[in-house]
Amino acid sequence: MKKVSWEKREKKKVAIERIDTLFTLAEKVVKYSPDLARRYVELALEIQKKSKVKLPRKWKRRYCKRCHAFLVPGFNARVRLRTDRMPHVVITCLECGHIMRYPYLREVKEKRKRKKD
């Protein structure tokens, strides 16, 4: 029983390391080979699906969900901050036009708390 859970843990650990390595490689090569970076992202996502591991937050927002391009602000992505009603970050993929929105309300609340103190 314990051996099985240990093996699962080890497999997940290896999967996370591989995913991290692939995203790091994608980050390095995206400037001169966007297609290779896209392939690295696709491989990382396949590993993530097969091993049923959560993608680390730092990488989750760095690729386009539609075309799997590795996003670099100013190169193939546009990043804007919006404060209408609910503050959020808008990331636009310049390769396929896909728009992703991420709220940053938690950060705003922390900033207000610090101002009051």
UniProtKB/Swiss-Prot annotation:
The keyword Thylakoid does not apply. It is found in: Cytoplasm. InterPro entries: RNP4, Rpr2/Snm1/Rpp21. Pfam families: Rpr2 (PF04032). GO terms for cellular component: cytoplasm; ribonuclease P complex. It comes from the Archaea. Its EC number is 3.1.26.5. Consists of a catalytic RNA component and at least 4-5 protein subunits. GO terms for molecular function: ribonuclease P activity; zinc ion binding. One of its GO terms (biological process) is tRNA 5'-leader removal. Its cofactor is Zn(2+). It catalyses: Endonucleolytic cleavage of RNA, removing 5'-extranucleotides from tRNA precursor. Part of ribonuclease P, a protein complex that generates mature tRNA molecules by cleaving their 5'-ends. Binds 1 zinc ion per subunit. Keywords: Cytoplasm, Endonuclease, Hydrolase, Metal-binding, Nuclease, tRNA processing, Zinc. The keyword Metal-binding applies. Belongs to the eukaryotic/archaeal RNase P protein component 4 family. PANTHER family: RIBONUCLEASE P PROTEIN SUBUNIT P21, RIBONUCLEASE P SUBUNIT P21. This is Ribonuclease P protein component 4. The gene is rnp4. Zn(2+) binds at C64, C67, C93, C96.
